[in-house]
Amino acid sequence: MVSFKSLLLAASAFTAVLGRPFDSFDGPDVNITDADELLVRRQVTANSEGTHNGYFYSWWSDGGGQVTYTMGAGSRYSVTWKDTGNFVGGKGWNPGTGRTINYGGSFSPQGNGYLAVYGWTRNPLIEYYVVESYGTYNPGSGGQLKGTVTTDGGTYNVYVSTRTNQPSIDGTRTFQQYWSVRTSKRVGGAVTMQNHFNAWAQFGMNLGAHYYQIVATEGYQSSGPSDIYVQTQCKSLCDRGRVTWRDVVC
């Protein structure tokens, strides 16, 4: 499940261990108020995927360092980490689609880390990323540059890389990784996934049947905090001041 996997091999000798079996967790819906901040915490060793407050979530860590994944109200999640190995997690949907994702929050890595829309497909088996922000390492730099796509107020460089006999959602397999990496970093805005899918197809980068699609925080040998929420159409209500993101489940 990890993006640093192939591309960080160009920068280090680290080999990530990904795609291990998950235990399921169906978290109860929690009514959150400003005065009653109830959180469900997942510790560094608790690799899992499931649903929480109407959203799909996935969390994986190799167990290194100190890292805590916290699922909050509605679509919100947060991660705090210090001197970690490798981890990736977030909230979103299952299956993935060409939806327009609105997200926001804060993301402040010290070292290698990034914030991305992250997902998988099967037939073909593809791991994909739309990277919105990153720390000290550009995760696309170890791949083959295919071109660019301009969408959602920015330009993204498109890369492809290959993982050979590496762990995946279907065990040890050989598969490709698709990347769109935003040239001007940001934390917050709209990501029109269909525009990336269309651009990838033009470069011969075809997807299969979608598995999950999350807005993920990932880190590798780094530290930092991340506090993110994800939404789709309901974001417009927040923009008009009718509700806040804490009140909305989309």
Curated annotation (Swiss-Prot):
Glycans are attached at N31. PANTHER family: ENDO-1,4-BETA-XYLANASE A-RELATED. Belongs to the glycosyl hydrolase 11 (cellulase G) family. Residues 43-231 form the GH11 domain. One of its GO terms (cellular component) is extracellular region. The active site is at E127, E218. It catalyses: Endohydrolysis of (1->4)-beta-D-xylosidic linkages in xylans. It is an enzyme of class 3 (hydrolase). GO terms for biological process: xylan catabolic process. The keyword Zinc does not apply. This is Endo-1,4-beta-xylanase G. It comes from the Eukaryota. Endo-1,4-beta-xylanase involved in the hydrolysis of xylan, a major structural heterogeneous polysaccharide found in plant biomass representing the second most abundant polysaccharide in the biosphere, after cellulose. The most favorable substrate is beechwood xylan. It is found in: Secreted. Keywords: Carbohydrate metabolism, Glycoprotein, Glycosidase, Hydrolase, Polysaccharide degradation, Secreted, Signal, Xylan degradation. Optimum pH is 6.0. Its EC number is 3.2.1.8. GO terms for molecular function: endo-1,4-beta-xylanase activity. Pathway: Glycan degradation; xylan degradation. The gene is xynG. Residues 1-19 form the signal peptide. Optimum temperature is 45 degrees Celsius. It holds the Pfam family Glyco_hydro_11.
